[in-house]
Regions:
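N-terminal Rossmann-like NAD(P)+-binding domain of SDR-like oxidoreductases, especially those catalyzing
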Residues: 1-176
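C-terminal substrate-binding subdomain of Rossmann-fold SDR/epimerase-dehydratase oxidoreductases
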Residues: 22, 194-319
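Short aromatic-enriched loop/helix-cap "lid" or pocket-rim segments at secondary-structure transitions
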Residues: 38-42, 128-131, 181-184, 250-252, ...
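Residue-level signature of the cytosolic catalytic core of signaling kinases
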Residues: 44, 53, 57, 130, ...
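Residues in well-ordered alpha-helical elements
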Residues: 59, 71, 83, 90, ...
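The catalytic Tyr-centered alpha-helix of NAD(P)H-dependent dehydrogenases
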Residues: 142-149, 179, 183-187, 211-215
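Hydrophobic alpha-helix immediately C-terminal to the catalytic Tyr-X-X-X-Lys motif of short-chain
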Residues: 152, 156, 160, 190, ...
């Protein structure tokens, strides 16, 4: 298949391209190469082409897409750091909302029978209490500029589907972790600071709960959706691995693994420092992934313990 991928130099996009290209798919990657991108994230193969354009540049986006004539469009490109969205929301609105609009408009001009896969987040649903899970039926209740921008883009896709019979699938996923993630994010920051001996900042008491999935497992779920258009078309899927951890337990677990596996001059647990909580910090996210498991036969292959060891090794080699 011919796959048109946005944000392929980023964390999840690069892992997806490496997986899909290795399986023989032809990939066109477009990326604006922001600070969070890294060209070295992609293992270059003859069936990958990279074009450095911004999805807010409609004319270039349209020309590139129409020249390529993809079978599927997988939209990963997004501004995603919640803290940055609080400081500078405009960038998030521009990329996540208007960039998505441009993709919808450009892909609507394709000649072939394409499939648009919109990658979103569980943060659009707001927060959970101590019980319950997000599902495909959960109402939207975004709490940050980031999640509001992603919720808006989800609604745009649904509007295009309902109004123009646009062939789309929406994916809402829990927190990904694994190789190629920018070091500003929580797990890379914990691992990197452990090896460097730097403080590990934890918001508030660290009691906020997140559901974690190893990025390779998520990418395999996306590829299943691409390969099963007849089932996935005009549907939404919530994807998670049922690996819930409080931020403080996550941090301690990683610190203890590194303490036990590597001879460092310091105890990583001593690096943990509690800082003022983030504005609008949602308490808990957790996903019920029954739909994709039942309809497409997907299941995660990596436990958190297995995935985090691979992740630690990656960041140790790329300090």
């Amino acid at each position: 298949m011919k796959l048109f991928v946005t944000g392929g130099y980023g964390f999840i996009g690069s892992n997806f391209i490496n997986l899909a290209s290795n399986m023989g798919h032809t990939v066109m990657n477009i990326d604006s190469v922001t600070y969070a991108a890294n060209r070295d994230n992609i293992t270059m193969r003859p069936n990958i082409k990279n074009v450095e354009i911004d999805i807010v540049d409609y004319n270039l986006l349209e020309k590139t897409m129409l020249d390529f004539q993809p079978d599927a469009i997988i939209h990963f490109a997004a501004e995603s750091h919640v803290d940055n969205s609080i400081e500078n929301p405009y960038v998030f609105l521009n990329t996540n909302i208007f960039g998505t609009y441009n993709l919808l408009q450009a892909s609507s001009k394709l000649d072939n029978n394409f499939h648009y896969i919109h990658i979103s987040t569980d943060e659009v649903f707001g927060e959970l209490g101590e019980e319950g899970f997000f599902t495909e039926e959960t109402s939207y209740d975004p709490k940050s500029p980031y999640s509001a921008s992603k919720a808006s883009s989800d609604h745009l896709v649904r509007a295009w589907t309902n109004t123009y019979n646009f062939p789309a699938t929406i994916v809402n996923c829990c927190n990904n972790y694994g190789p190629n993630q920018h070091k500003e994010k929580l797990i890379p920051k914990i691992i990197t600071n452990c090896f460097l001996g730097n403080d590990i900042p934890i918001y508030g008491k660290g009691e906020n709960v997140r559901d974690w999935i190893f990025v390779e497992d998520f990418c395999k779920a996306i590829l299943l959706i691409v390969q099963n258009k007849s089932i996935a078309l005009n549907e939404s899927f919530c994807i998670g691995a049922n690996e819930e951890l409080t931020n403080i337990d996550l941090t301690k677990k990683i610190c203890e693994i590194i303490n036990n596996r590597f001879s460092l001059e310091h105890n990583c647990l001593d690096l943990i420092k509690h800082v003022d909580d983030r504005l609008g910090h949602d308490f808990r996210y957790a996903i019920d992934a029954s739909k994709i498991k039942n309809e497409l036969g997907w299941k995660p292959e990596n436990t958190f313990e297995k995935g985090i060891l691979k992740t630690i090794e990656h960041y140790k080699e790329n300090l």
